[in-house]
């Protein structure tokens, strides 16, 4: 790289990262870059995120102020019951293993993405919103070439992406799903972005686009004009926790991912990890037990209590190690989520995670926007489908995270991957801080995930690793033959001890990095 680095963006696609870099070079800050990047991701990673979904932005400003923008999806204000709406299963083929998801118009929750991006821009942005949309508009109109990960996600989600003619126009314009090396175009989405830049979020929530949405949904959804008009972004104080003399900032309740990461780190802080060589059976056993205890704590203390005002103090304040393990819930093999991390030269840090679920299969007519299926996500509905409280923010495992050293951003990261989000972030934090691996190696190092008495391990150099592990709870181990997106996609940026900036995109999900230069 020639010239001085003035910022770095890590994301799930090279063009997503490039969009953020362009904003930094235009004089924007980390928050401008994050917004431009996620708008670009709605084009080049559209099977993972969408203006029809939601997410979270964790912001640490150069003035040492921190904010968590919660723009995740909201349940409708009236629950008509599952039988009253268009809500049905669809089976997806994960290369020999089939899994069922629930989609349809009745699976759609109120999307928060548009409101959230405008709220963050109003509070923290520097560049005009019309500038932030420019990369996404260019990608949508001029087209972009599908990469290997686009090919995988499009192929996997084909039954959902092609449910309607609107989806087939974009994802299968010649009758077959677009594949790697082919070019995709989304000109209607470019028009939507320009309308949003001109009219603001009211056009989406109270205006012409709202009419299009509700007319297309008809009686098949629980959503009403009031649901859309009443949507509010929640600006929360991030959850703060200590780990090895550093401050951890992450997503607070009512989302579960951040508090579970803080809980796991609290458990690990009791151990001198230098006595547990990275990759050894002892280290894998320890981390597996920590993950198991975190899952147990979620079931016993969090599920059903995430909207209680004192849940942080109660959950992180006591010793839960003696609790009994129960049976864990469903595992989402994909985790249709993407993440963006940004550092700028002024000391601002942005960590933004967003998702559309698997998508509902329903597109807003004439826009190229597929709406979410959050009401059909089993891990977001632990009490069962259509048991949700009306008018309430859904919980999430998304956990944008920032680690501070003397109130300065040291590490900014997040991940996709549903229930593996927290285990992926936990391991990268420990690889980088405890084991002092360079960020690229910390992200690239093999990972594990424990869930439902099943331990999944990426390939390791330790011979017969499964034979060396001992579990008394019936846990069964599976050693994968190669690294896989199942284990998350951690995209992170950091400041080095020399004061320079570095970034890493997780190769498991075709991650990429872009640096802005003077």
UniProtKB/Swiss-Prot annotation:
Cite the entry's keywords alphabetically: Acyltransferase, Glutathione biosynthesis, Hydrolase, Protease, Signal, Transferase, Zymogen
Does Zinc-finger count among this protein's keywords? no
What's a Pfam family in this record? G_glu_transpept
Pathway(s) per entry = Sulfur metabolism; glutathione metabolism
In this protein, the active site sits at 337
Example GO biological process term? glutathione biosynthetic process
**Catalytic activity annotation:** an N-terminal (5-L-glutamyl)-[peptide] + an alpha-amino acid = 5-L-glutamyl amino acid + an N-terminal L-alpha-aminoacyl-[peptide]; glutathione + H2O = L-cysteinylglycine + L-glutamate; an S-substituted glutathione + H2O = an S-substituted L-cysteinylglycine + L-glutamate
Q: Which InterPro entries match?
A: GGT_bact, GGT_lsub_C, GGT_peptidase, GGT_ssub, Ntn_hydrolases_N
Does the record carry Cytoplasm as a key word? Answer: no
Q: What modifications does the entry list under PTM / processing?
A: Cleaved by autocatalysis into a large and a small subunit.
Enzyme Commission number(s): 3.4.19.13, 2.3.2.2
- Gene Ontology molecular function, alphabetical: glutathione hydrolase activity; leukotriene C4 gamma-glutamyl transferase activity
Cite the record's note on assembly: This enzyme consists of two polypeptide chains, which are synthesized in precursor form from a single polypeptide.
Extract the NCBIfam families matched here: g_glut_trans (TIGR00066)
Q: Family, per the entry?
A: Belongs to the gamma-glutamyltransferase family.
- What name has this protein been given in UniProt? Glutathione hydrolase proenzyme
Source species, please?
Synechocystis sp. (strain ATCC 27184 / PCC 6803 / Kazusa)
Q: Which gene encodes it?
A: ggt
């Amino acid at each position: 790289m020639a010239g001085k680095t003035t910022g770095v963006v890590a994301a799930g696609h090279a063009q997503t990262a490039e969009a953020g870099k362009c904003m930094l070079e235009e004089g924007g800050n980390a928050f401008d870059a994050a917004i431009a990047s996620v708008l670009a991701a709605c084009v080049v990673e559209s099977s993972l995120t969408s203006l029809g979904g939601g997410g979270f932005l964790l912001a640490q400003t150069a003035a040492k102020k921190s904010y968590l923008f919660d723009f995740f999806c909201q349940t409708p204000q009236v629950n008509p019951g599952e039988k009253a709406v268009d809500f049905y299963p669809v089976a997806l083929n994960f290369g020999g293993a089939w899994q069922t998801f629930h989609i349809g118009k009745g699976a759609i929750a109120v999307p928060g993405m548009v409101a959230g991006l405008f709220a963050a821009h109003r509070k923290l942005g520097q560049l005009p919103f019309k500038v932030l949309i420019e990369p996404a508009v260019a990608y949508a109109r001029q087209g972009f070439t599908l990469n290997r990960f686009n090919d995988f996600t499009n192929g996997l989600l084909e039954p959902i992406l092609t449910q309607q003619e609107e989806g087939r126009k974009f994802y299968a314009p010649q009758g077959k799903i677009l594949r790697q090396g082919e070019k995709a175009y989304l000109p209607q989405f470019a028009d939507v972005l320009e309308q949003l830049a001109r009219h603001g979020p009211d056009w989406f929530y109270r205006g012409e686009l709202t009419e299009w949405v509700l007319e297309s949904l008809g009686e098949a959804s629980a959503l009403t004009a009031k649901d859309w008009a009443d949507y509010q972004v929640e600006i929360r104080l991030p959850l703060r926790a200590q780990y090895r003399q550093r401050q951890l900032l992450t997503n607070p309740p009512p989302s579960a991912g951040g508090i579970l990461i803080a809980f796991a780190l609290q458990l690990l802080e009791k151990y001198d990890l230098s006595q547990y060589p990275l990759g050894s059976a002892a280290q894998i056993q320890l981390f597996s037990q920590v993950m198991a205890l975190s899952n147990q704590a979620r079931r016993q203390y969090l599920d059903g209590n995430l909207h209680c005002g004192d849940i942080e103090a109660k959950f992180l304040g006591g010793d839960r190690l003696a609790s009994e393990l129960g049976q864990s819930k469903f595992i989402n093999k994909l985790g249709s989520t993407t993440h963006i991390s940004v550092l700028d030269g002024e000391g601002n840090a942005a960590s933004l995670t967003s998702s559309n679920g698997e998508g509902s299969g329903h597109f807003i007519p004439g826009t190229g926007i597929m709406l979410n299926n959050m009401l059909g996500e089993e891990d977001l509905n632990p009490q069962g489908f259509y048991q949700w409280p009306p008018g309430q923010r859904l919980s999430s495992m998304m956990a944008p995270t920032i680690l501070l050293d003397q109130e300065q951003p040291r590490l900014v990261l997040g991940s996709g991957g549903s229930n593996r989000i927290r285990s992926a972030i936990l391991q990268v934090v420990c690889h980088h801080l405890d084991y002092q691996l360079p960020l690229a190696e910390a992200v690239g190092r093999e990972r594990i995930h424990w869930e439902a008495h099943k331990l999944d391990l990426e390939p390791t150099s330790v011979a017969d690793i499964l034979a060396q592990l001992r579990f008394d709870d019936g846990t069964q181990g599976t050693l994968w033959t190669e690294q896989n997106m199942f284990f998350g996609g951690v995209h992170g940026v950091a400041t080095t001890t020399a004061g320079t900036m570095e970034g890493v995109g997780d190769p498991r999900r075709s991650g990429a990095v872009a640096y802005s230069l003077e």
